[in-house]
Amino acid sequence: MAALAAGISKQRAAAQGLGSNQNAVKYLGQDFETLRKQCLNSGVLFKDPEFPACPSALGYRDLGPGSAETQGIIWKRPTELCSNPQFIVGGATRTDIRQGGLGDCWLLAAIASLTLNEKLLYRVVPRDQSFQKNYAGIFHFQFWQYGEWVEVVIDDRLPTKNGQLLFLHSEEGNEFWSALLEKAYAKLNGSYEALAGGSTIEGFEDFTGGISEFYDLRKPPGNLYYTIQKALRKGSLLGCSIDVSNAAEAEATTRQKLVKGHAYSVTGVEEVDFRGLPEKLIRLRNPWGEVEWTGAWSDSAPEWNYIDPQKKGELDKRAEDGEFWMSFSDFLKQFSRLEICNLSPDSLSSEEIHKWNLVLFNGRWTRGSTAGGCQNYPATYWTNPQFKIHLDEVDEDQEEGTSEPCCTVLLGLMQKNRRRQRRIGQGMLSIGYAVYQIPKELENHTDEHLGRDFFQGRQPSTCSSTYMNLREVSSRVQLPPGQYLVVPSTFEPFKDGDFCLRVFSEKKAQALEIGDAVPGDPHEPHPRDMDGEDEHFWSLSEEFADKDSEISAHQLKRVLNGLLSKRTDMKFDGFNINTCREMISLLDGDGTGSLRPVEFKTLWLKICKYLEIYQEMDHSRAGTIDAHEMRTALKKAGFTLNNQVQQTIATRYACSKLGVDFDGFVACMIRLEILFKLFRLLDKDQNGIVQLSLAEWLCRALV
């Protein structure tokens, strides 16, 4: 219940602008300005109660409490490590980033790339902090997390051994911005150890809010040069590297002076006329050092003598700044992988940059309702969340070789908080997605889930290349104009997890979650429906010997269980007392807490209708129905509910084996009827909004 309320509150705050980089969410409710002011007024240095300087902040296994790796660690403030600590010395550069005893080189590479773009850097590392002015032992940083920017506050106590920083540190002995940034990121993810092992892409995205693509340069797509060209034009961050097959190869230099295992930045592409033929060039930068490529098109290479002198003057950069040109064909031969981080619109201010359009959805896979697994599980696949994208504007600059106009879309499916959950044994799920073209006859279908029949025998237009246990799977797709259904899923069904689905499009795209409405039109029987069997019905129960009497919840339980126990076509252990109280709440017209005969007749007709639906769904006659079948059963009963409500129902009414018995099924139906009835009575303006005082809310909630 608390989680649901928090989720609603979060959605409403986001609608008001909370979560932007200018108005970041306060992580764990900690406000930097308020806390710093309190410390300055009291004359004490900040000690973070949410991420204390203790073993649990270091880790849970290799760096866990009592482990050999943590012996001798002392937490110290920079003011205890040197006489003149500085936040940043002479600007933030790649030399400020030196790896310590933690396997987070992926994070270091991302930070190094961030230093090349000052505007993006200072979104993450606010400049309003130092060890001199207003120093109070407190610092703050901002990270993008699943659709919102989060401000993380830390104290400046850092883990040391023998007087030296244990983890990330600067080449300048008195500079601490990078070590403090690493600590803030560790806090966000639960511990320092949680940062071990990862992809540079993950850091790129958390520092920019962008969406990333990965290309294996051993199997490059034919349009890769064009993709790089467009990415640079959109202000994207591009990185490439040469894979290493073993630890001995790390830092090794090739014959032509390329460093293996290092992240290079891609900074430009150009096509030149070389000896009468077009030659594609690419410009790279090694942010880690001055070692440069010595092959074709390097600074002193003879190829420059065969192009137009004016063009040569524009492109031939002779300064030893780590930046160099090479042919695109050599690039594909020498490098192993390319990563592109496409920036979200709010990251870019220049009007010259062609910005992406962004649509973002947050969702959840819940066992028994929306965790349907991949296409290999047709019985449950259709229950996964479904999202509709409407593409009606084609790209302005169509790619060479494309015969028909198309729309370029970047799809990214990201699972949430799995790094933070490592300490409780929850690793990454294998995730993926499929995209289906929606036929014309279903283009206006938005109010309810597409069912199993839609997917039967239908092939997706495109899908993620494979299901992978990465934080995010993403791909660039080109689709003809039309409407498409995106289905994100885990590989196996019944896996709980939160996710974020992002759609980046070159032109504005309309997108929505299928079945987001919650209409309800339950079956309303009338006592006249039983007139023909009146005497037979009353003879079944001694409780109604006097037809003017009323029955309580305990009497109702005895009557109903007695009636249903006579049936031989169902397995049923009886209604519990709480379900019977819910029944009375629905039909008790005079507020006495009991049912009159006419009300009981209406209830019995409802139960008969529910039983008919239940038995239709109980295919095995086992006395339970699968929780994922509740969506279909609810629809038959008149309720078309969105994913959030379906997930709540599965959590509330399904047992640990994901079955729903008849008592739970009826309790769910009755509860839904009560809630819909209450809302409609209170929604006088019929605008879908009800306002209640606390006392009114409590009275209605306790009904």
From Swiss-Prot:
CDD domains: Calpain_III, CysPc. Undergoes autolytic cleavage between Ala-5 and Ala-6 which gives rise to fragments extending from Ala-6 to the C-terminus, Ala-6 to the EF-hand 2 domain and from Ala-6 to the beginning of domain III. Residues 513-531 are annotated as: Linker. Gene3D superfamilies: 2.60.120.380, Cysteine proteinases (3.90.70.10), EF-hand (1.10.238.10). Predominantly expressed in the stomach. Localizes strictly to the surface mucus cells in the gastric epithelium and the mucus-secreting goblet cells in the duodenum. SMART domains: calpain_III, CysPc. It is found in: Cytoplasm; Golgi apparatus. Its cofactor is Ca(2+). GO terms for cellular component: Golgi apparatus. Residues 45-344 form the Calpain catalytic domain. Keywords: Autocatalytic cleavage, Calcium, Cytoplasm, Golgi apparatus, Hydrolase, Metal-binding, Protease, Repeat, Thiol protease. Binds 2 calcium ions. The concentration of calcium for half-maximal activity is 0.3 mM. Inhibited by calpastatin and calpeptin. Changing residue 105 to S: Loss of activity. GO terms for biological process: calcium-dependent self proteolysis. SUPFAM superfamilies: Calpain large subunit, middle domain (domain III), Cysteine proteinases, EF-hand. InterPro entries: C2_III, Calpain_cysteine_protease, Calpain_domain_III, Calpain_III, Calpain_III_sf, EF-hand-dom_pair, Papain-like_cys_pep_sf, Pept_cys_AS. Belongs to the peptidase C2 family. The domain III mediates oligomerization. This is Calpain-8. The gene is Capn8.
